Amino acid sequence: IDYAFLDRTLQATRDSGQKLAFRVMCCSTTRNHPYHPKWLKEIGGRELQTRYQGQGPLSVPDLDDPAVLEKHLDFIKRLGAKYDGHPDIEHVDLGSVGWWGEWHMSGSTGAKMPTPDTQKKIVDAYLDAFKKTPLLMLIGGGPMLKHAAEHGTGWRADCLGDMGGFSKTWCHMRMAYPKMLPEAGALDAWKTAPVAWETCWDMRKWVNEGWSLRFIFNYALALHGSY
C-alpha cells in the first residue's frame, strides 16, 4: 500500500476543508494501464485476458485465484488497520470487484465476475476492516448488497438523472433503482449509513432532454441521499 500517497491526499483534503471518500479498483478498462500491481504475476497470481466493449486486450486479476484473493484480503485488512476511523475520511466505497470496483463486468469478453463465495469473502473483509468508518456499496451488487446492507452499510447509485439517455425503453430512475433497492432490503439503510448519488451527465443535459429537474431532485431526496 502506498501510504504516502494516501496521506498526501488526506492532507490535501484536510487543507481544503473537506473529507475524502474513496474506492479500491482492481479491473481497469484502459489498455497498458492496469490497476493491479506488477508483482502479482511474479508471485504466481493469475491474470485474465479480456476485452471491454471490443477494446483490448486488457489484463485483470483473477480474484478467484487463491494467491490473488489472499493478497487482496490482506490488502483490505491492512488498509483498515491504518485508516479505519480516520477523521478525514467520510466513507469508504466497498469496491474491489468488477470494472472500476463497481460490481459488474458488463461488456467484458474473457473475464467474468468472481464466484459468490469470493465476493462474500471480499465484502466480509471490508466489514471486518472498517468498524468505525462508514461503508457504502454500489446498488448493482445484487445479493452482496443485501449481505452488506444487513451488516450496516449504506449504498451508492450511479446515473441519478437518467430518464432515458441510454435507451428509449429503459432508464435507471424508473426501472433500475426501484427494483434493486427493495430486492436488497436496502431502503432503510439511510437511517444508519450514508447514501450517495453519482449523476449521469449534468443539469444541462437534463434540461436539453426535457427531463424535470424538480422530479430528479425530489427523487434523490425521497431516497434520503446524503451526497
What is the predicted role of each segment?
Residues D2-F5, D64-F75, P114-T118, N208, ...:
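Soluble or luminal CAZymes and related metallo-dependent hydrolases
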Residues I43-G44, Q53-Q55, L79, D84, ...:
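Feature targets compositionally biased, intrinsically disordered low-complexity regions
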Residues I1-Q53, M113-P134:
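Aromatic-lined substrate-binding rim segments of carbohydrate-active enzymes
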Residues R8, D74, A81, D128, ...:
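Charged/polar, solvent-exposed surface patches and flexible loops
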Residues L48-K112:
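Active-site groove signature of glycoside hydrolases
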Residues R14, H91-Y227:
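Catalytic-core regions of glycoside hydrolase
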